[in-house]
Every structure is written in structure tokens, then in C-alpha cells.
């Protein structure tokens, strides 16, 4: 591809302002910039800062290849998560979501207008929760819009047709959105979709690959809303690290600790950035980890606030942790701040991942050949756990979704930990995850389906 052709095209990435969405579009932005494209990343100021601070797996200098733009929105409340809320959905983020949905359009429109006068073509890659970006792209004669699918493409099959043949053939259960998300969030999503209905979209970019979801990709392509659109399954978007990559400085303390552990001996425990465990559940999980006598790295932190820079940094678990860390010294490590998940999953000492089953975490874990102990919390996570355990066969279920309001006792958690780490059935799941990891990594290698789709996407936007 001629350099002048690449430089005459601007890619504008418009993420939804939540961690699991911010990082997927930043990974894609870095991939495209590494291929010589001019890439612009646009989000509210705290979320630009957050995305830059938390991205990992890349050479830090790579961020210099991205043009970052602030989308100014009015001030919004940034409360702490409500630990007494009846639903695990992070409804404390709704003021920020509402402010973004109402106000991000105008600064984005101004940015697109400005770029359209400087570049031959503008490709707007927007999180599908931001349909207004497609509307603004359609106002420009030299712009195309592409939705980014930040969740499993199979989730879209269930959303459009819960009775689809693929679900029934594999015995998969899809839960209605109202069961797993707050009514306020579902209403916001539908309202935004209705307001932007009819905005032309040139195609769909997906953080998945045919090795994982090939059947579901074909099923979605056949659905009326997507017929005629171009599909680019370019995942995994996250870098694929070798164990050696996890040993480059500067290093997090947990990686130094992992260096001292035997191969495939450590359970990594983390529940993402939008989930909290009640104190009683923390105590039960702690008892399970201690009772299992397995090595572990446990990231114990509450859900992000809307503005992570407004957080106090104090842990509500300080008193509990002082005793627990003493009792498990040498066996486990508790991290109360941000942890480098990709490096942990790539590390040779890590055997498995107990997770909330966000799609980022699922695909990061599988791409490094690590099975998942599934503990879904909200949103698409119950579906991801269903896909993981009953379709990929690379996970074990810790907590069924129907028990999400219950405290899971230590004995039940410990049983799953021991199955994953010690039993023949757990070994089969771990072997299956390794096989999937090899297939996923082959997808992004030369000649792989995801590499081809990324090449096709770049070829299309630079045509």
C-alpha cells in the first residue's frame, strides 16, 4: 500500500466510556497506526487519560502514534458503587453514560468536519453503543462509518433471535437484556438506537475470530439488519504476549511474584472494573482460596467510578486483608489496585483465570490458552459464561446466573477451584483452552483469517 494512500485516510475511533470498551478501541487504534494509518481517538478527557494509563501489552512509545482528542461533556456525578444495590449492574455509572450520550455528538461532529477537510477519506470506527457517530459520519461526503462489536458476536445472535437454531442445537440459553442489565441502561441503549435509526453503516468490525465464533459470524451476517454489510472479524485485538514479554521492565510486583512460582500453578482471580463483591462474598471467596491450598493472585478492588481519578484509593477491605495476607503468605498475593491482566495471563506460572466473564477477559484468557472459572456478574457476561462452558468447553461454572443474588459458600467455590487445578476433568478443560489458544493465535498470524480480515478492512478504507 502506497504511503501517500495510507496517510490520506484518517481513522477516528469513538469508544463508549467504560473500561472494557475504551481499551478495545485503543488496541484497534494501535494496530491500525502500526500499519501506517493516521488514527484519532476521541473520548471525554478523563476517559482519554484512563485509556492511555491502563493500556498494556504494547511498547509505551506506541501511544505516540495516536492522535488523542477530548470530547468535552458537561460535569456529571461520579459516585462510588452502591454496595447495597439489589442488582450487580453498575448503575452508579448512569450519570456519566447519560451525559456522554447527550453531549458527545457536538464535539465529535466538529472533529469529523475538521478532519474531513484535511484527509481524502475519513473512516469512523464507533462502539455500537454510540450510534450517533454513524449519523455524524453520514453528513460528510468522504466519510464511512463502521461499528465495533465489543461483545461476542454470538451475543448478537441471541439478542436478535433467542430461539435461533444455533442456540437450540448446542443447548445454549440466552437471557433477555432486562434480566442482566438495569432498566435505565436498557432504555438508554434503545433510545439511542431509535434516534439514530437509518444511519448508514458500511460494515462491522469485531473483536472475535472464526476459530471461536465462525458459526455465529455466518448467522449474524444472514440476519436482515446486517445483510449487505461488510464483516471484518479481526480479533483478538489485544496483543498476544509470550511469557518472555511479561518479563520486560518496568514490571508490576505481581509479575515478580509469579516469576517465583512453578509453571501452571497459579489461579488468577479478578472480576473486572464494573463489578463489586459484597463483604460476605469476599469472606467466602477468601476461605475458598485458603482452603484449596492453591497458589493465587487475587485482584480485590471495587468497581470504577465514572471518573476513576475521583477515587479515594482507600480499600474497604483493609482490615480483612491484614489478616488474610498473613495467613496466605507464600501461597497467594492480593492486589488492591490496577493489575496488568495481559501480562498475568501470558505468564507461564498462571494456570487458570477466575473471572466475571467480560468479553475482553474471555478473549484475553483464551488467546493465551488459559481456561476460565466463570462467575458472571451482569450485562453480556451470563451469555459469555454460557458460551465459554457449554460451547467452547474451556471453562467451569462457579456461580450460575440464577444465583447472582445469593452468597456462594466457600465450599462450593473451593470445589470448582480444586476441579480446575487438580482433577482430570479440569485438566481436560485446561487442555481445551490451550488448543483454542493455538487456534486463536493462528488467526492473527500470517495467513490467518483475522489477519486477512484486518488487511481487507485496511484495503477497503484506503481504496
Swiss-Prot record:
Alphabetized InterPro entries for the sequence: UDP_glucos_trans (IPR002213), UDP_glycos_trans_CS (IPR035595)
UniProt keyword annotations, A-Z: Glycosyltransferase, Transferase
Reaction catalysis annotation: cis-zeatin + UDP-alpha-D-glucose = O-beta-D-glucosyl-cis-zeatin + UDP + H(+)
Residues engaged in binding an anthocyanidin: 21, 91
Active-site residues per Swiss-Prot or TrEMBL entry: 21 (proton acceptor), 127 (charge relay)
Keyword Hydrolase assigned: no
Top enzyme category: transferase
Tissues expressed in: Highly expressed in root. Expressed at much lower level in kernel. Weakly or not expressed in expressed in stems and leaves.
Enzyme Commission no: 2.4.1.215
Residues that, per the record, bind UDP-alpha-D-glucose: 339, 341, 356, 359-361, 364, 380-381
GO molecular-function terms, A-Z: cis-zeatin O-beta-D-glucosyltransferase activity; UDP-glucosyltransferase activity
A Gene Ontology BP annotation from the UniProt entry: regulation of cytokinin-activated signaling pathway
pH-dependence annotation: Optimum pH is 7.5.
Any one Pfam family match given in the protein's UniProt record, by short name: UDPGT
Function noted in UniProt: Utilizes UDP-glucose as the sugar donor and catalyzes the formation of O-beta-D-glucosyl-cis-zeatin from cis-zeatin. May regulate active versus storage forms of cytokinins and could have an impact on seed growth.
Family in the record: Belongs to the UDP-glycosyltransferase family.
Name of the protein in question: Cis-zeatin O-glucosyltransferase 2
Species in which this protein is naturally found: Zea mays
Gene name, Swiss-Prot/TrEMBL: CISZOG2
Amino acid at each position: 500500500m502506497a504511503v501517500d494512500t495510507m496517510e490520506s485516510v484518517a481513522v477516528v475511533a469513538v469508544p463508549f466510556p467504560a473500561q472494557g470498551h475504551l481499551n478495545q478501541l485503543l488496541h484497534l487504534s494501535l494496530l491500525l497506526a502500526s500499519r501506517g494509518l493516521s488514527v484519532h481517538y476521541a473520548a471525554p478527557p478523563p476517559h482519554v487519560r484512563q485509556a492511555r494509563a491502563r493500556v498494556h501489552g504494547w511498547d509505551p512509545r506506541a501511544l505516540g502514534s495516536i492522535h488523542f482528542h477530548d470530547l468535552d461533556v458537561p460535569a456529571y456525578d461520579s459516585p462510588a458503587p452502591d454496595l447495597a444495590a439489589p442488582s450487580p449492574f453498575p448503575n452508579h455509572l448512569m450519570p456519566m453514560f447519560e451525559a456522554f450520550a447527550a453531549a458527545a455528538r457536538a464535539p465529535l461532529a466538529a472533529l469529523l468536519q475538521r478532519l474531513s477537510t484535511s484527509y481524502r477519506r475519513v473512516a469512523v470506527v464507533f462502539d455500537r453503543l454510540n450510534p450517533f457517530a454513524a449519523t455524524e459520519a453520514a453528513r460528510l461526503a468522504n466519510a464511512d462509518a463502521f461499528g465495533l462489536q465489543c461483545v461476542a458476536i454470538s451475543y448478537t445472535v441471541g439478542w436478535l433471535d433467542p430461539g435461533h437454531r444455533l442456540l437450540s442445537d448446542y443447548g445454549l440459553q440466552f437471557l433477555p437484556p432486562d434480566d442482566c442489565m438495569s432498566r435505565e441502561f436498557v432504555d438508554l441503549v434503545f433510545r439511542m438506537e431509535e434516534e439514530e435509526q437509518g444511519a448508514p453503516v458500511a460494515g462491522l468490525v469485531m473483536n472475535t475470530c472464526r476459530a471461536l465464533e465462525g458459526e455465529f459470524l455466518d448467522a449474524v451476517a444472514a440476519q436482515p439488519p446486517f445483510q449487505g454489510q461488510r464483516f471484518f472479524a479481526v480479533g483478538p485485538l489485544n496483543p498476544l504476549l509470550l511469557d518472555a514479554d511479561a518479563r520486560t521492565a518496568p514490571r508490576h510486583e505481581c509479575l515478580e511474584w509469579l516469576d517465583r512460582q512453578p509453571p501452571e500453578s497459579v489461579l488468577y482471580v479478578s472480576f473486572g472494573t464494573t463489578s463489586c463483591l459484597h463483604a460476605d462474598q469476599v469472606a467466602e471467596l477468601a476461605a475458598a482460596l485458603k482452603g484449596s491450598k492453591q497458589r493465587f493472585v487475587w485482584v480485590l478492588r471495587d468497581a470504577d467510578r465514572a471518573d476513576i481519578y475521583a477515587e479515594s484509593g482507600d480499600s474497604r477491605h483493609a482490615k480483612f486483608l491484614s489478616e488474610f495476607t498473613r495467613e496466605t503468605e507464600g501461597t497467594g498475593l492480593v492486589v488492591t489496585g490496577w493489575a496488568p491482566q495481559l501480562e498475568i495471563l501470558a505468564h507461564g506460572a498462571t494456570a487458570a483465570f477466575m473471572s466475571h466473564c467480560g468479553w475482553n477477559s474471555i478473549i484475553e484468557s483464551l488467546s493465551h490458552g488459559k481456561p476460565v472459572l466463570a462467575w458472571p456478574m451482569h450485562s453480556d457476561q451470563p451469555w459469555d459464561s454460557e458460551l465459554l462452558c457449554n460451547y467452547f468447553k474451556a471453562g467451569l461454572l462457579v456461580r450460575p446466573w440464577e444465583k447472582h443474588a445469593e452468597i456462594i459458600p466457600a465450599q462450593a467455590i473451593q470445589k470448582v477451584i480444586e476441579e480446575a487445578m487438580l482433577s482430570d476433568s479440569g485438566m481436560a478443560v485446561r487442555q481445551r483452552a490451550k488448543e483454542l489458544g493455538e487456534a486463536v493465535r493462528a488467526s492473527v498470524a500470517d495467513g490467518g483469517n483475522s489477519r486477512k480480515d484486518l488487511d481487507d478492512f485496511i484495503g477497503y478504507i484506503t481504496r
